Amino acid sequence: VITKDCMNLTNCICKSVIKIDRLQNKTDCTCEKTIVPIILYSKDFTPLKAFGNVGDVEDDCFGCFETSIFKIEYICKTTCCGKLSLLRPIDEHGSIAKTICETFRLEETDFCIDVNFHCFCALQRLSMALVNRPLGGIIPK
């Protein structure tokens, strides 16, 4: 249920998500993907959290991780529902970041969640420079 006091703000979130989705799908001559990392906040301003590689089923060196940072994969303009992929937060030492503030680098993953963007009242865009940012010669653990 969308409350009256959040209705306009919710529509604002949907519009922002649509704009970011368009930006990410815009192509240019460089053939590089544009990824705009986002954090979504619930009505009590708690960041959305999701888990990737639960049960360590994917063959990667990190195992299960928690994140509040996502990439928009898809949004349905009529329902304001869509799909987010989880961005893996990495600290400056190449390990999974334990907090958002420890995040030095973001890595794309194949882990996704489906969301209703009407459930959120705030969206924070993070720097695109975080995505696949070099660790400065540090080898990930």
Predicted regions and their residues:
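Short glycine-rich, low-complexity segments
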Residues: V1-K141
